[in-house]
Design a protein with these regions (language model features):
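N-terminal cationic and glycine-rich segments that engage phosphates or anionic surfaces
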Residues: 12-140, 145-156, 196, 253
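N-terminal organelle transit peptides
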Residues: 6-10
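Positively charged, low-complexity, intrinsically disordered RNA-binding extensions
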Residues: 157-262
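Positively charged N-terminal leader segments that act as targeting/secretion signals
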Residues: 262-282
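Short, small-residue-biased leader/transition segments that mark boundaries at the very start
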Residues: 1-2
């Protein structure tokens, strides 16, 4: 349990900015206008499951409160959120969604975990298998790659949104049970044991500290660098196909995406441009 600071970053190192030992390389679904409909569909399913499991009151249902926060971060209208909760609470809600997880391998042994929420497991299994096959990967058995990841609570706080200084913020997090607190150029990262995530989250909320992201996630223990053009094409094909599937909730992998920003790729670019590419996950330079 310790505090790490990474304030000084040379130009040659900027492609690794934010890539701490706890850096999560979860493949996030795009949140542009074209993808909003899919994002809202996914969140709607999560609302339905959260309400079914813990009731419609977010004050007494932490899981639902988390989904609502995620919905608002994705600019989901409040009336859409409320309709989803009301629909999930009604007796006429006959759609039953189930969580399922698939594990497999991408190019050069990259590990991929796919978490889904579906009303038809046969359809979902076929679609996920197709994504791996088209990217020359393979589906494995349960547990074949999950041992390469650690399940952790992860909270990201943007510095521009937080008036509290780093030392005070660190003490609040650690006192509430956080395992680690780190500082990057523009954000703070808090890591927790999954069982302590809710307590740490509540402690930050009590201090009215805005959280840019807060979730229990899968963090790779090690990362795989892909440099061959064929490997890059194949892993992007797998991830793109999974992105297009509404049943897919989250995709975790240990491909070191940031390593693709070699020095010769970013020399001549100003820092703002490099940050834009990194922050927007724009990994199509090859």
């Amino acid at each position: 349990m310790y505090f790490r600071s990474n304030k000084q970053v040379r130009k040659e190192e900027v492609f690794m900015s934010g890539h701490s030992k706890f850096a999560n390389i979860k493949h996030k679904k795009e949140k542009n206008d074209a993808a909003k409909g899919k994002i809202f569909t996914i969140i709607g399913r999560e609302i339905a499951v959260a309400v079914k499991d813990g009731g419609p009151d977010p004050a007494n249902n932490f899981k639902l409160a988390q989904v609502i926060a995620k919905a608002k971060a994705s600019n989901m209208p409040n009336d859409t959120i409320e309709r989803g909760i009301k629909k999930a609470s009604g007796e006429g809600n006959s759609v039953n969604y189930e969580y399922c997880t698939y594990e497999g391998y991408g190019p050069s042994g990259t590990a991929i975990i796919v978490k889904c929420l579906t009303d038809n497991k046969n359809r979902t299994a076929a679609n996920v298998r197709n994504a791996f096959t088209k990217g020359h990967g393979s589906i494995g058995t349960q547990g074949c790659v999950s041992y390469m990841f650690d399940e952790k609570g992860q909270i990201i706080i943007a510095k521009e949104d937080c008036e509290m200084d780093a030392d005070d913020l660190m003490m609040i997090a650690l006192d509430a049970g956080a395992e680690d607190f780190s500082e990057e150029d523009d954000s703070y990262e808090i890591i927790t044991n999954p069982n302590d995530f809710e307590a740490v989250h509540a402690a930050l909320e009590a201090e009215k500290i805005p959280m840019a992201e807060a979730e229990v996630t899968m963090i790779p223990q090690n990362y795989v660098e892909l440099t061959a053009e064929e490997d890059l094409t194949n892993i992007n094909r797998i991830l793109d196909l999974l992105d297009d599937d509404d049943d897919v909730q989250e995709v975790y992998h240990n491909w070191d995406e940031l390593i693709r920003f070699k020095v010769h790729k970013i020399n001549g670019m100003d820092e703002k441009s490099v940050s834009f590419f990194i922050n927007k996950s724009f990994f199509t330079l090859y």
